[in-house]
């Protein structure tokens, strides 16, 4: 049976690649973007019968509710949800504007919460559905300058772990995708890097520069990640959390080893509370 996909951030990058993979697979897509005119090529290529473009800013809960409602009315069901929209700016904690910090959390975390909440009644009534949260390797590690973005991604992992337990009995599956570098514009023009203050040049400044230099040569290709999503979708028991990319596997493994070693080092003190 063909599936109906609801995808946020469908106009470019990973969201567009997943939308195209779903459509090439014979499915239909509720394609959302802040600027729906950017979805014109997708509609022209696959037809308005299978591509339903919807304006959506995921930080606006009322807009989320309306987008889900209109998409559901168009196709009669929603089978797959891809929470993909998000962005990162780079700044030291001491330097970052509080409004910028909150805006990143709103887009990267609350957008996931809003969309997940909006689709749950539909999926629960259907007794089926699969929600994919596009998180990041940054949901398992920390990098200087990405405090807002990575705080949100860590929270997406926690939120989704709880959500999976709440909805499993309804036939709803949850998968958190945790990619490393993806060959998109994430670290290019999409990312703002305010002036880094002198004390943080060696940490935040150096890391921001490394992101800029690597932009366009990241390991993972959006279309290949889209194929991974299709494969996971076909699994009877899909993973709750899935690292994506050789860099993600490497760095997450190293981070887990460091944490395990620290836990073991301080084990005796940890047990002293009883």
From Swiss-Prot:
Return one GO MF term.
Answer: oxidoreductase activity
Q: Which Enzyme Commission number(s) are listed? A: 1.-.-.-
Q: Top EC class per UniProt?
A: oxidoreductase
What does the UniProt keyword field contain?
NADP, Oxidoreductase, Virulence
Q: In which pathway does it act?
A: Polyketide biosynthesis
**Induction cue:** Expression of the botcinic acid clusters genes BOA1-13 and BOA17 is coregulated by BCG1 during both in vitro and in planta growth.
Active-site positions on this chain: 135 (proton donor), 149 (proton donor), 153 (lowers pka of active site tyr)
Annotated signal peptide: none
Record keywords: Aminoacyl-tRNA synthetase included? Answer: no
Please name the Pfam families in this protein's record.
adh_short
Q: Which residues are recorded as binding NADP(+)?
A: 14, 32, 57, 84, 117, 149, 153, 182, 184
Give start-end ranges for the coiled-coil region(s): none
Q: Which domain of life is it from?
A: Eukaryota
The free-text function statement in the UniProt record for this protein reads: Oxidoreductase; part of the gene cluster B that mediates the biosynthesis of botcinic acid and its botcinin derivatives, acetate-derived polyketides that contribute to virulence when combined with the sesquiterpene botrydial. Botcinic acid and its derivatives have been shown to induce chlorosis and necrosis during host plant infection, but also have antifungal activities. Two polyketide synthases, BOA6 and BOA9, are involved in the biosynthesis of botcinins.
* Family designation: Belongs to the short-chain dehydrogenases/reductases (SDR) family.
The protein here is known as: Oxidoreductase BOA17
Q: Which organism is it from?
A: Botryotinia fuckeliana (strain B05.10) (Noble rot fungus)
User: What is the gene called?
Assistant: BOA17
